[in-house]
Structures are given as structure tokens and as C-alpha cells.
Amino acid sequence: MNSGIDLQGTFIKSLMDLGIPPGTAKAIWMPLPMILMLIGATVGVLVCVWLERKISAAAQQRIGPEYIGPLGLLAPVADGLKLVFKEDIVPAQADPWLFTLGPILVVLPVFLSYLIVPFGQNIVITNIGTGIFLWIALSSIQPIGLLMAGYSSNNKYSLLGGLRAAAQSISYEIPLALSVLAIVMMSNSLSTVDIVNQQSGYGILGWNIWRQPLGFLIFWIAALAECERLPFDLPEAEEELVAGYQTEYSGMKFALFYLSSYVNLVLSALLVAVLYLGGWDFPIPINVLANLVGVSEANPVLQVVSAALGITMTLVKAYFLVFIAILLRWTVPRVRIDQLLDLGWKFLLPVGLVNLLLTAALKLAFPVAFGG
């Protein structure tokens, strides 16, 4: 399979062609993935927050943000600036080290996970062969930060929120991993680029959502629970726990939790688009479109347009899923903590195992359709 163009290798090779020594070229590259991640994730979050406020307003028959910039587009920026300039208070009885480390451990793995997301055709920051495994490993760090934040606050509501968050995250990580494992089994690779390539060539009919409808539902439900979105926002249920593990946080530390929540939502939507909806792939194969227009596939202009539209396609799919997640907030009531854990352990986990066994059986029976 075509592994795509690795941005790291291409960038370093381009600098070496200009006469820059390999060591210097690698040193120049080192901060760039972090900068790209920060810029991309921040812009994604700003769009996500604006969408949430506008869609929530529409659901409640309000106008929503309107006066801060055109259509209220700068309202999320104003929110961010407000949080940055707020006083950062550490409670007198809190553990200052753990209190500070908690938000960092929550937000850092989410940003690092963007490294393995292919945003468009041949556009991935680091194309490593074990991208999915790296994402699962990074996501398992988050519960530690949540529990640390709740425990270090020395507040009963924060502690209960932290315990709930850790229990919820651990409960839904396993079904999430099982649904991803079925995709890995079909594509014979842990690389996100290979998974998208495995779906390409047949347009919308080749997308994994048709071969893995059960896995798609498990992944989406588990992803919403991991992001603590309604109806799974038990760790910070305002009516029960004030603000959960975030109760004692203010200023920039609170902003990190706020940022992490939305970055995680956009990341989950991007991963669903990559794993189940063909990533950058068009609903109609690009070669069919080229033949209809009468343009050769080797045409460099077509390749550039195809790459640009591929990025757009990935983002459209991802933000459609973000729209669904926001809509669910205003249409589904919050579940109880016992119902939430029962759903994870007694329903999603067994169904995930059955889905994995079915995928293995179908792969043996129909190797062409299921990646044998």
C-alpha cells in the first residue's frame, strides 16, 4: 500500500538538498510538529466552540454569539483571552505540585495524538507504522491526570468527580480499543495512512462503516464517553458535583481542561473520519471524476486540487460528527453513573468482543471484502 509522503522525511530531505547538514536539518524540524499541532488544534477548537455556541443557541431558539466579530466568530477568542488573564488560584489545602500536574497530564496526550492523524492525502505529520497503538497508549494517560486533579484539590466534589472521570475513562477505553482492533484486523496495519488507503478505490462503498457498522457505533459511543460529552458528562455534572474535578480550578489551569475537552472532541471526530468514513477519500472515486471531466489522473493540477479537496473532505466529515455530538447534548438526557458503567462493562464490552470475533470469521470467509 502507498504509505503516503511523510512530512518529516520530505522536509529534512528538502533542507539537505539545499546544502544544510543532516543534523541541522533534523534540529530545524524538531519544533515544527509541535507548532503545527498547536496551531491546527487551536484553530479546530475555536471553530468547535463557535459551532457549539451557535448550535446550542439554535436549539434553544436564541441567536447566540453575534457582536464579537462577524457572526460572533471571535467569541471563542474572547473566551480564551478572558481565561488567560484570570487569576490562577491554588487552594490553601491543595497539593500544589499535583494540582498543577493534573491539567498538564490531561491536555498533553491529546495534543500528541494529533501526530498520527492524516489530515489529507499524503499529509501526515509523522507516519509511523504503529499510529493506532500510540493513540491508544496516549489516551490511557488521561485518567491519571483526571484522578490527580480531583485528589489534589482537597475537595469532596473534586475527588468524586476525579474518581468518576477515571472510572468512566477506563470503562470505555476497552470497547474503544476492541472496535479499533477490528479495523486493524481488516486493514492488516496499525498505520492510519494504510487504513485510509485500504478504504480507497471504491468511493463511498469502500468505507469501513459498511463493513463495521457495529464497530462504528461502539467507537462513537465510547469516544463521546471519553470526551465527557452529554449524555456522559457525569464527572462534571453541575447539578450533582458543582463542576467535578474542575471545581477548584481557575485561570489558565481551568483553560487547559476546557481546551482538552474540545481538542479531544475534534480528535475523536477526525479518527472516526479516518477509520470509518474513508478519511480524505471522496464519495465518488477520483479516477471516475477525472474521466467525467476528461482530465488525466497524472495531470499535476488535478493532483494539487485532489490533495486540497482531500483535506477539505476530511474536515467536513469530522465537523459533521462534531455537529452530531453537539446536537446530542440538547436531545439526550444525562444517564446515571450506574447506568453509564453498566453500558460500558455489560453491553459495549461484550458486543465489542462479538464484533471482533465476527470480523475474524468474515475475514476468513470473505478475504477480498474483509482484507484477508
Swiss-Prot record:
Assigned keywords, A-Z: Membrane, NAD, NADP, Plastoquinone, Quinone, Thylakoid, Translocase, Transmembrane, Transmembrane helix
PROSITE patterns: COMPLEX1_ND1_1, COMPLEX1_ND1_2
Pfam families in the record: NADHdh (PF00146)
EC numbers on record: 7.1.1.-
Subcellular location: Cellular thylakoid membrane
Membrane topology: Multi-pass membrane protein
InterPro entries (UniProt xref): NADH_UbQ_OxRdtase_su1/FPO, NADH_UbQ_OxRdtase_su1_CS
GO cellular component: plasma membrane-derived thylakoid membrane
TM stretches of this protein: 27-47, 65-85, 97-117, 128-148, 166-186, 204-224, 266-286, 308-328, 347-367
Isomerase keyword on record: no
GO biological process: aerobic respiration; photosynthesis, light reaction
PANTHER family given in the database record: NADH DEHYDROGENASE SUBUNIT 1, NADH-UBIQUINONE OXIDOREDUCTASE CHAIN 1
Record family assignment: Belongs to the complex I subunit 1 family.
Protein known as: NAD(P)H-quinone oxidoreductase subunit 1
Species this protein is from: Trichormus variabilis (strain ATCC 29413 / PCC 7937) (Anabaena variabilis)
Name of the gene encoding the protein in the UniProt record: ndhA
